[in-house]
Amino acid sequence: MARYETVIGVEVHAQLKTKSKIFCSCSTRFGVDPNENVCPVCSGMPGVLPVLNATVVEYAAKMGLATGCVVNPVSVFARKNYFYPDLPKGYQTSQFEQPICEHGHVDITVDGTAKRIGITRIHMEEDAGKNIHSAADNLSYVDLNRACVPLIEIVSEPDMRGPEEVVAYLKALRAILVYLDVCDGNMEEGSFRCDANVSLRPVGQAEFGTRAELKNLNSFRHVQKAIEYEVERQADILDDGGKVIQETRLYDAAKNTTASMRGKEEAHDYRYFPDPDLVPVRIEAATLDKWRAELPELPEARRARFVADFGLSDYDAEVLTAERDMAEYFEAAVAAGADPKKAANWMQSELLRELNQAGVAARDAKLTPEKLASLVKLIDSGEISGKIAKQIFPDLFAQGLDPADYVRQKGLSQISDSNALESAVEAVLAANPAEVEAFRGGKTKLMGFFVGQIMKATKGQANPGLVNELLQKKLG
């Protein structure tokens, strides 16, 4: 593979979190009955006129500002003409020659190496409907609930050189969208979708190779696997002296392969032209300044602050800031008195596992940040051991219980009375004379065995530090 350089550009479609569609007042709510959120405008009836949702312009511009784009004071909608059953008007309202945003970037880090990925453009457009194919009656149905739902398409420069960079770019882009609260980033529901354009060229060659566009990439893992397969496929063709065909290929996750969907000769000539039903979008400088002032702290800035202010590692800061609600949960826990590094460890282990199993976001967890802070402080004070804390965490999480009250009610406080523990230590040593003799003979690793037996005898409530101290004294 060292003979070839991989070149990848990505197109992302992000559904915006508006309450109504881009050109009509129909709801954008997901999961309703087919064709429930439909009107004459989004079903393409003749004689109707679109009315632009102003919030779409605001959200698109804010994404442009957050990614360092030039936000154009004037942008124009265009008709993208093609025929498909889920496109009732026979064209998609999009932007072409004059998009709302251009010339931005996103910074990524892969294996400790920082890189800047260019963004060619961000433009507004409407989503298409959805075709539903029924094998039972050999029919295809069209659901127009998604038709006219607002999208922004984010087109990158061909700056990525491998699947790891693509995944890092997509995660960074998704995080920005979620932090801005303009998109929920849900890949399973299709609100964050991407296509990847992949090509190879001999190392040292400036000219791009022939690209294949990969579709049906609905998870970060699928993106990684599809690109890996496609790179290998194209390399095999070139090694055999063949030529890569420009085409669109569909990723099959079950087989981990890509298959041809359509070739260059089948590619659409979309015949773009300005939409006569929509006036140019004009953004005043004062409005843009207002939107810029409303931008939240973005993931990269928050990550750097977590490292500087809380002493977290780059890795911990990256994990905690990947999701806005996790970052806010962490800050709330620290504000409630939790040690930052210990709170970070609990969040990345116990809390994250419970959140994933329950399928809930951190902001919806019954165990509040203040209660997590209380748990961390109970461990720090010696009231309970880390082992006990892990044992009770599922109950605390599921019921949103107060840790201090729960520990008191269950009698789980750590035993730190040296007299009480001394009896337990003597009992364990008396029950294991052979191990005591072996320890005194040099097998010091048996210390862990003795500690384990004492913890078992005290049901995990013995103070580990005091146990070690007493054992050292007794075995001295």
Curated annotation (Swiss-Prot):
It catalyses: L-glutamyl-tRNA(Gln) + L-glutamine + ATP + H2O = L-glutaminyl-tRNA(Gln) + L-glutamate + ADP + phosphate + H(+); L-aspartyl-tRNA(Asn) + L-glutamine + ATP + H2O = L-asparaginyl-tRNA(Asn) + L-glutamate + ADP + phosphate + 2 H(+). It is an enzyme of class 6 (ligase). It holds the Pfam family GatB_Yqey. GO terms for biological process: glutaminyl-tRNAGln biosynthesis via transamidation; translation. GO terms for molecular function: asparaginyl-tRNA synthase (glutamine-hydrolyzing) activity; ATP binding; glutaminyl-tRNA synthase (glutamine-hydrolyzing) activity. Its EC number is 6.3.5.-. Belongs to the GatB/GatE family. GatB subfamily. Heterotrimer of A, B and C subunits. Allows the formation of correctly charged Asn-tRNA(Asn) or Gln-tRNA(Gln) through the transamidation of misacylated Asp-tRNA(Asn) or Glu-tRNA(Gln) in organisms which lack either or both of asparaginyl-tRNA or glutaminyl-tRNA synthetases. The reaction takes place in the presence of glutamine and ATP through an activated phospho-Asp-tRNA(Asn) or phospho-Glu-tRNA(Gln). This is Aspartyl/glutamyl-tRNA(Asn/Gln) amidotransferase subunit B. It comes from Solidesulfovibrio magneticus (strain ATCC 700980 / DSM 13731 / RS-1).
